[in-house]
Amino acid sequence: MTVVAVDGPVGSGKSTVARRVAARLGYVYLDTGAMYRAVGLLATEAGVALDDEESVVALARSAGLRFDGDGRLFAGERDVSDAIRTLEMGAAASRVSALPGVRGLLVEEQRRLAGDTDIVMEGRDIGTNVFPGAAVKVYLTARPDVRAARRAAELRAKGDEVDETQVLAALLERDRRDSTRAVAPLRRAADAVELETSGMTLDEVVEAVAGIARRQVGP
């Protein structure tokens, strides 16, 4: 089993990069952030307060989260892959991920899903918490304005009307929450390779991460 951990803040491009790197290496791809977004979505729809740890943990435990072969996320039989990709659900994910019980439950599930498979797993605490012994650790980052522009472009591509100033404000608040939470905060693992991607194209970032993986674990 080889784990390639791709961590970084919102808008750093880790989802797209990790998915393409996994395809290039022939590895499985797993988006851990989607799981927290799904729990946030289900809690919001159920009217559960996002800081009510006991209720959110119970909801997460019964959610039946699973990925299909195309990487789409289901809660039971419902495909929630598109519904979770909003600024609101990003903020909800940040709040529920700070709850120790929720994080503990989902980290356990992420390790179970990985099994003994070669996998590219992306999130905010893969290299520091989920798989601290990962063979490859990469931390992607970029300037806040660049990350906000990327996130706004993603939302517009879905047909959403967005104000880039509001996207930037939400991004900075997400950074604050994720980096200051008591449990598994967002930070670069000491042995991770950091890539500042502000001036890089997507193809360049994918090639760089795939190259790092190949050098560290072989072709």
Task: Describe each region flagged by the PLM.
Residues V4-V6:
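Hydrophobic anchor at the beta1->P-loop junction of P-loop NTPases
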Residues P9:
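P-loop (Walker A) phosphate-binding loop of NTP-binding proteins
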Residues K14:
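Conserved lysine of the Walker
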Residues V17:
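Hydrophobic positions on the alpha1 helix immediately C-terminal to the Walker A/P-loop
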Residues A23-L87:
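N-terminal phosphate/diphosphate-binding loop that engages ATP/GTP or pyrophosphate donors
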Residues S81-D160:
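ATP-dependent NMP and nucleoside kinases share a basic, alpha-helical "lid"
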Residues Q110-D116, R124-N129, G133, K158-A208:
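Small-molecule kinase domains that catalyze NTP-dependent phosphoryl transfer to phosphate-bearing small molecules
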Residues K137-V146, R151-E154, E194, T201, ...:
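Glycine-rich phosphate-binding loops of nucleotide-dependent enzymes
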